[in-house]
């Protein structure tokens, strides 16, 4: 069953078709590379086909944030409502081959929808996700005890250089300015972050926010001063404000902060935050990842999904 279209749904920047399925905004100019890369080709009855371009690869497979973006796009398409929460389990590491994406509206209530998403490859599950979607009705009780991280201004933040041959390909899709915490490999802080935007300016929406929660170099690199494989086991994303945030333009960067506190037997957590330049919290994330020694020249396999049962 599809939820009815409502003013609350449309108020969050989604165009909703008459049957409740999210309609893509009309194309009035060139398609942004991110939209082209994360496009879902309809395959009928809540199913789509997708591909993972080489520029989103981490080693042999796509970046976990890219896969999260596909899941976010499918969940919104199936429900016709804006994403509020997305929990992803990376059960295997897909290759660059075509992907099959499916979404099922498990429940559509008056205000919220629950959607399950599967990303498969050659009939085998790669990512299992569950999404909560809802508009933001007027009259909700609000409070804000958040505090924006202290960071260097954008103009004073050095560009993160990505010329090294082993840098994961997907990081070239972003303009990254280091502004807080430790640089990767510094062993000076248990947090890292800075200003982040797509290389070509683009307004924030749920798929892009999902991708950004897994875009920065792992906080573990700043905490340990070492580089190692850091595949993601699971990732949870909470979207805290309407998208795009009022007052933000496509040219604006978001401030990101990622931190870690504990690794036991190579299993570690990372907490993430995305902020507007004006100091409003946009989204929060937490992921559980692995820290694995592997002879390599660089951080080439960072930020990929865990391999699951796939042979190395």
Residue ranges and their predicted role:
Residues 2-4, 10-312:
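Terminal targeting signals and extreme-terminal segments of soluble enzymes
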